[in-house]
């Protein structure tokens, strides 16, 4: 089961993800992250994947969707601390938010 913990700061929102991100977990994560973005309207969203042990294509969709959402708000997304398993998925999808 995946979880997300948020650390807001002025103009930024950090989302620390842990666990396995699959199609079951993605929906709940998306709702939680979107609610925080809507409430805080950050200029920068940082998604930290250091605690993620597995990610399938649903995780790729989670990242792409948050990137589009941040772009629509005039902000940006940074993906950081992706373990090798996650980085391989990002490379296959040609995601360069890192």
Where are the model-predicted features located?
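STAS-typified acidic loop motif
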Residues: 2-31
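Amphipathic alpha-helical interaction surfaces in cytosolic regulatory modules
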Residues: 23-98
